[in-house]
A protein has these predicted regions:
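Membrane-helix interface linkers and caps
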Residues: 38-65, 84-101
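A well-structured
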Residues: 30-31, 95
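Short, hydrophobic transmembrane alpha-helix segments
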Residues: 18-30
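Alpha-helical transmembrane segments and their membrane-interface exit regions
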Residues: 36-46, 191-199
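Hydrophobic, membrane-inserted alpha-helices
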Residues: 13-20, 168-174
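Hydrophobic alpha-helical transmembrane segments of polytopic
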Residues: 10, 31, 35-39, 187
């Protein structure tokens, strides 16, 4: 029964739970809490029901991955602050000049989150293609670090080179700043993208 749940229902349950938490809990720590909670749930499931027994990671590997996850979380927060400080002013001016500040704030948050998700994933798709197509972009972004793991698990799935965080955060930042997206919709989208990637 647990195996069937994991196979067919875990991913939708995770996404619904994360979006529900975002909608129902008003806390600045919701992102951090859901990421940690999801890592605990998936890490426990990997231990209890590993997809392959050979993939069970030694404790030292899990600890080092956990340290890297925390470091990258801090680094990604700093990238977000840097983008806010350096890009918000110029992109707001461009948005005003081109009349792009028309975001539908009155629409349901879930609809807004999926709109941002689709638009940012479209941009990210082309960035990701460029990373794989051109050696220069591959090296500049450090994308190879993401592909260096031989066994993926809940902790190392999204470990990227710190430089790649600039590329990862760029699509949502551009959309948010150009179209006047509200903080709640942008935050819900970041949670959605993160949890979809983990699960």
């Amino acid at each position: 029964m647990l195996d069937k749940f994991i196979q067919y229902a875990l991913h939708p349950v995770i996404l619904i739970s994360v979006l529900s938490a975002w909608l129902l809990i008003d806390s600045p720590f919701i992102f951090f809490g859901t990421v940690i909670g999801l890592h605990v749930v998936l890490g426990t499931l990997e231990y209890v029901r590993p997809a392959r027994q050979a993939w069970v990671s030694p404790a030292l590997n899990k600890l080092s991955a956990l340290v890297l996850v925390v470091m990258l979380f801090v680094a990604s927060t700093m990238v977000g602050v840097l983008y806010d400080n350096q890009l918000l002013g110029p992109l707001s001016q461009v948005s005003g000049l081109l009349g792009l500040n028309f975001w539908p704030h009155s629409w349901p948050l879930l609809v807004q989150a999926f709109m941002i998700f689709l638009a940012s994933e479209f941009i990210w798709y082309w960035i990701h293609r460029a990373e794989h197509k051109w050696t220069f972009v591959w090296r500049l972004s450090g994308h190879g670090a993401h592909h260096s793991f031989k066994q993926l698990n809940a902790l190392n799935f999204g470990l990227n080179h710190p430089l790649e965080l600039f590329f990862l955060a760029l699509p949502a930042a551009l959309i948010g700043m150009l179209f006047g997206v509200g903080e709640a919709a942008l935050g819900a989208t970041i949670l959605l993208v993160t949890q979809a990637s983990i699960a």
